[in-house]
Structures are given as structure tokens and as C-alpha cells.
Amino acid sequence: MAAPQLIFVDGTFAELAQEMAEYVQIGEQVKPYLAKEQNEEALQAIIEASHVLNSIPEKEFTGAYNLLIHLVLQSKDPLKYLPPLCGNLQKPITSSPAHGFTLAANALSTVFNLLEPDNPTRFNVLLQITRFIRQHGQYDLLKPRLENLEGWFNLWNTSDEDQRRLYVEVSDTAAEAGDDEDSYRYLIKAIATFGREDQDEITSEEAQKLSLKAVRLAISHPARFDFQDLRILPSVQALGDSHPVYSQLLDIFIEQDLEDYNDFKDEHEGWVEKEKLDNEKLQRKMRLLTFASLAASTPNREIPYANIAKALQIPSEEVEMWTIDVVRAKLVEGRLSQQQKVFLVHRTTYRVFGEKQWRELATRVDQYKSIVDQLLVFLRKGQADVEGQREREQQELERKLAGAGMGGGPGGDRRRQQKPRTDEDD
């Protein structure tokens, strides 16, 4: 989307409309409308013939479309004419195959930017722009503007349904551009527009379809390990009734381990393959999540290689490789002790934080409290020892001073006494 711009036109609506009509070769047809001041009828005829602008010389394209956009925005009902105008811009610019995308993108941006910021019609134009961007695979051009999306929705008072339409369009556009992170993020935003208290809405076909898509994206994405934003959505929770197997699989990825996943596969033999899910990717992800759970549940923060190999169901010689992978995934921080054959946990990520995790946290707090209590005892003993030593040194100093004659008593003052002065001394 281009930066905001102005277009400069000079003339009355009738003069400019007649000029445009001549340009699209319907001058005679439009004259009677303009003579009777039937401006809407004249504009309708011009819009219907405006597809010919896609074949005019490249150097005339921007000026012609700017004039057409100006005429549309002078209408009593611009929304009536904007869809066909934007639709024409999404068709090939035959006069400029090399620069057609840029020419059309600039024209669409002009429409958007010339509308008042709070004009709800901007929503429809933005939807058309998103579809145009998707058609040409240029998501990176749209992405920076999407940061304003929620603010625009508030400004335009956009309905939940329309918000969902645009979020889904953006999600699909991002997916086709290979931006899986944005695709998932906007899909979650789309699902969140379903009314939380409206049971009919969250169990609707559309809600269940989008929720199922989000679950598949979440469990399949190699770098997504947090599913809490997904699980709290009512329509996703409703999958427990409409798609119970998917719901069960999601629960495994949220808080269970590799053994549970393998049991799931045995229970639903062939289901993963039938649903076209990649078992190798899912299994790898479950191993990483299982490692994270193991690290979080180990009280002494030291995990023997043997425990890791058992939990991940891997040969012992692969333990170090998987440890490196889980650290790279930022699920765990720590270091390997090859000499002791243990992994020393510095920090771990809790996959969920429920009653079990609170108990583990309480255990660790008690352990830390015990350590702190021991430190306090040690510090107090050290402080008492220091004070005792200081007192002994003070007593020793006083004893030495007394022995050196500084304390008074017999022989304590060896200074020669002065003889009283008399007259004979003179």
C-alpha cells in the first residue's frame, strides 16, 4: 500500500464526468444524463465502461484512474461504485504487463487514502486490497499496515462477521506467502470473533472449520509449543463434541508426553495418515515437549542421560543431540555434563500451569526455604564467631596495655618528680 497522496482536479462534476466519458468512449451516451443533472446515472454508465482503462497507455493510466476515483468519491453513494472500480484494478493491466501490479496497487491505495479515516467504506477497500495482494503474492507490502488493523476496526465500528472475513483473508494471504506465524496469528484472531456466549455461533460449521484448521496448524508447526491461546477459545473447546479425536490429540500436545502420543496412535490406528498429518514431525515435536515436561518436573534440576533416553524413547547416544535441539527451541536452558552424564537445568518452560505444577512449585519453594534457613544458620553462627573473636581480641589488647604500665598502680609512674623551686635556686 502506497503512502497517502492527493489528487488535483479542476472543473465541475459535469465537466469532469464528460471528459471521462469521452475517454472510455461513451461520451454521447452520458451527455443527456449530465444535461438533466442525473449525475448518478452518468457515473453508473462510466463505471460500467471503465474496464477499458486497463488497456490505455501506461503513462495515462494513473491520471485517468485518479479522475475516475475523484468522480466516484463525489457520488452520494461511493460504496455502490467502488467494488466494480476495485474489481477492474484486480484484472490484468494489458498495456503494461511489467508494471501493472504497481500501477493497480497505487490506484487502490489512492482510493483507501482519499476516504476519511473513520469512513467504514475503507473496510471494503482494504478487503479488496488484501485480495489483490494475495493474488500477486506480495504479502510483505501489506504486512506493515496490518499493525493498524484493530484500531481501524474500532474506528469503523466493524462487525464481528466483517472482522472475521478480513482476518481469514489475511491469514490465507500470509499462508500462501509462507509466513506461517502470521497466518496462525490472524486465524486465531478470526476465531476469537465468534461470540463466547453464543453456543450456536461457536458450534457453527464455520467456527468448527476454522478451529479445526487452527488445531492442525498449531500441532504441525515445528516451532509452536504454546497452545494456551488456542485452548481457551470456546469454538476450539467445542471440537470435543464435533471432532473428539482432534480434541484428544490437542490435549496430548498441551500437557501430555510421547508415551501418550504413541498410545493415541495405537488407539486410532491409521488416523494420523488418513488426516494427512506428518507423523514424523508430530513425533519429533512431542519428544521436545516431553523433554520440557521432564525438566520442569525434576526437583533437583539434574536429569541423568538415562532418564532422558527413556522418556524420549531414543538411544542413549542421541541424548546430547536432542538436548541441543530442545535448548534451541527455547523450551529449556541448561548445560550438559558429559563427565557426570547429566543435564543441568537452569530454566524451563511450563507447558501448562495447573494443580500439578502448583504442587511442584510448592515443593521447590520448600526446598529453597530449607536452603535459605541453612544459610541463615550458617551466617548467624559466622556472625557470632566474629563477634566472639572481636571480644577476645579486645580483652587481649586491654591485658597487654595493663601489663605495659598504662593502667596505674606501684611503679606505674616512673616520671621524675619536679623539685619545688626556692629563692636559693636563683
UniProtKB/Swiss-Prot annotation:
Return any one Pfam family short name: PCI
Q: Does the keyword Protein biosynthesis apply?
A: yes
> Where is this protein primarily located?
cytoplasm
Q: Where is the PCI domain?
A: 179-350
MF (Gene Ontology): translation initiation factor activity
Q: Which UniProt keywords apply?
A: Cytoplasm, Initiation factor, Protein biosynthesis
Which domain of life does this protein belong to? Eukaryota
**Where is region (Disordered) located?**
385-426
Give the PROSITE patterns listed for this entry: PCI (PS50250)
* Listed GO biological process terms: formation of cytoplasmic translation initiation complex
Q: Function, please? A: Component of the eukaryotic translation initiation factor 3 (eIF-3) complex, which is involved in protein synthesis of a specialized repertoire of mRNAs and, together with other initiation factors, stimulates binding of mRNA and methionyl-tRNAi to the 40S ribosome. The eIF-3 complex specifically targets and initiates translation of a subset of mRNAs involved in cell proliferation.
Q: What name appears for this protein in its UniProt entry?
A: Eukaryotic translation initiation factor 3 subunit M
Per the UniProt record, the source organism is Chaetomium globosum (strain ATCC 6205 / CBS 148.51 / DSM 1962 / NBRC 6347 / NRRL 1970) (Soil fungus)
